[in-house]
């Protein structure tokens, strides 16, 4: 077998990269380790309207559950604010269905898709990645290619085999657990977030409505906070207090340390969770993965067309994605580090300072004015305002 591009990983990042490479005329092979694309689910499923604007996708009923118009943030000591800021407007997705839709779109654009296919090693020619060794339903196989796009998740081994430093430390990871629940009475248009040591130390708990009495209820906490109690114990207590009925369980890890230092090398690009292209504050990665994967697919097409798959040429991928989302990631990382340092009383005070305010168009300037009477909050936030 021989292809222009082999994409490893069939989730949002991999399928999106495969689609854009294929639509630009490349021969593409997409390898997914699981028997079924979209499972197991490792995502809460919330996206903003900007996801659809930037990807060109339409919020089709095949993979959207509910329209979100507001977000409620609950503090550890009772503070609560609700915002209808345009930035929170979006949809809750049926993630399994989205992943399948994106893989189907890639296939319709011309990509070959193989499930139950685990990439185990890379093939090199003159120091450049030039193929993949994988184990599929028919045994171990080798495939030659012009280049590889690694979208194999937070524990990416492929990028490391190419010489890139992608190993995340335990302190860099957020442990996430989630139930899909039934029989819940929640506002179908409002996402709920809970902060504080009781709910999710160094993280947050979420309730995302899916309509018809269903919701995704989960939490993510930093690994450093898991020494005494695991994330599941916090989630189970919340579930028991509210009497939610569990119908599905999912778990995973998310890198919240910002992107890896380098996302390219000779013959290979890294995208999505494998590259740390995740919002360090929220842990959200669907939108960022799609943005960066589009760039990866386009750069792959440019590289194959020009006959240049060396790292110097492929560095344009990193320059483009950092220009597009780099500043936002840096800002989110600062916010996350500051929030990590807040105790329950400070978190609640911050939320109470915003109660009754018009949050529909809040900006950093207006936030400064709101907090002018809270010197301790200004001290905490001064690095990012």
From Swiss-Prot:
Enzyme Commission number(s) from the entry: 1.3.-.-
Statement: the UniProt record of this protein carries the keyword Transferase: no
Pfam families per record: FAD_oxidored, GGR_cat
Transmembrane regions: none
Reaction(s) this enzyme catalyzes, per UniProt: a 2,3-bis-O-phytanyl-sn-glycerol 1-phospholipid + 8 A = a 2,3-bis-O-(geranylgeranyl)-sn-glycerol 1-phospholipid + 8 AH2; 2,3-bis-O-(phytanyl)-sn-glycerol 1-phosphate + 8 A = 2,3-bis-O-(geranylgeranyl)-sn-glycerol 1-phosphate + 8 AH2; CDP-2,3-bis-O-(geranylgeranyl)-sn-glycerol + 8 AH2 = CDP-2,3-bis-O-(phytanyl)-sn-glycerol + 8 A; archaetidylserine + 8 AH2 = 2,3-bis-O-phytanyl-sn-glycero-3-phospho-L-serine + 8 A
Cofactor note: Binds 1 FAD per subunit.
GO molecular function, one term: oxidoreductase activity, acting on the CH-CH group of donors, NAD or NADP as acceptor
GO BP term, example: glycerophospholipid biosynthetic process
UniProtKB keywords: FAD, Flavoprotein, Lipid biosynthesis, Lipid metabolism, Oxidoreductase, Phospholipid biosynthesis, Phospholipid metabolism
Keyword Ribosomal protein in annotation: no
Binding residue positions for FAD: 13, 32, 43-44, 46, 95, 119, 273, 285-286
This protein's pathway: Membrane lipid metabolism; glycerophospholipid metabolism
GO cellular component: membrane
Cofactor(s), by name: FAD
Family: Belongs to the geranylgeranyl reductase family. DGGGPL reductase subfamily.
Note: Reduction reaction proceeds via syn addition of hydrogen for double bonds.
Protein's job: Is involved in the reduction of 2,3-digeranylgeranylglycerophospholipids (unsaturated archaeols) into 2,3-diphytanylglycerophospholipids (saturated archaeols) in the biosynthesis of archaeal membrane lipids. Catalyzes the formation of archaetidic acid (2,3-di-O-phytanyl-sn-glyceryl phosphate) from 2,3-di-O-geranylgeranylglyceryl phosphate (DGGGP) via the hydrogenation of each double bond of the isoprenoid chains.
Name used for this protein in its record: Digeranylgeranylglycerophospholipid reductase 2
Source organism (scientific name): Methanothermobacter thermautotrophicus (strain ATCC 29096 / DSM 1053 / JCM 10044 / NBRC 100330 / Delta H)
């Amino acid at each position: 077998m021989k292809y222009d591009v082999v994409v490893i990983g069939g989730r949002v990042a991999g399928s999106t990269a495969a689609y854009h490479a294929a639509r630009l005329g490349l021969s593409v092979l997409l390898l997914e380790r699981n028997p079924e694309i979209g499972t197991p689910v490792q995502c809460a499923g919330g996206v903003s309207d900007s996801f659809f604007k930037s990807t060109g996708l339409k919020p089709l009923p095949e993979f959207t559950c509910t329209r979100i118009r507001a977000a409620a943030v609950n503090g550890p000591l009772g503070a609560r604010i609700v915002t209808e800021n345009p930035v929170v407007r979006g949809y809750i997705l049926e993630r399994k269905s989205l992943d399948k839709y994106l893989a189907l779109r890639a296939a319709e654009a011309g990509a070959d898709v193989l499930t139950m296919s685990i990439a185990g090693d890379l093939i090199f020619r003159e120091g450049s990645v030039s193929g993949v060794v994988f184990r599929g339903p028919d045994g171990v196989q080798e495939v030659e290619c012009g280049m590889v796009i690694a979208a194999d998740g937070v524990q990416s081994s492929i990028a490391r085999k190419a010489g890139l430093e992608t190993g995340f430390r335990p302190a860099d990871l957020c442990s996430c657990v989630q139930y899909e629940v039934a029989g819940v009475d929640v506002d179908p248009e409002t996402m709920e977030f809970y902060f504080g040591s009781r709910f999710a130390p160094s993280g947050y708990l979420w309730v995302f409505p899916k309509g018809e009495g269903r919701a995704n209820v989960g939490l993510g906490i930093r690994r450093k906070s898991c020494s005494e109690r695991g994330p599941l114990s916090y989630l189970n207590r919340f579930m028991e207090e509210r009497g939610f009925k569990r119908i599905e369980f999912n778990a995973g890890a998310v890198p919240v340390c910002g992107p890896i230092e380098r996302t390219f090398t000779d013959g290979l690009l890294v995208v999505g969770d494998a590259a740390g292209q995740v919002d360090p504050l929220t842990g959200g990665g669907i939108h960022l993965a799609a943005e960066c994967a589009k760039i990866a697919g386009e750069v792959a097409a440019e590289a194959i067309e020009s006959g240049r798959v060396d790292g110097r040429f492929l560095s344009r991928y990193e320059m483009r994605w950092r220009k597009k989302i780099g500043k936002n990631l840096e800002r989110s990382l600062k916010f996350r580090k500051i929030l990590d340092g807040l105790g329950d009383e400070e978190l609640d005070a911050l939320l109470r300072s915003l109660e009754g305010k018009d949050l529909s168009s809040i900006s950093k300037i207006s936030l400064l004015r709101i907090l002018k009477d809270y010197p301790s909050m200004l001290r905490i936030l001064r690095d990012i305002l």
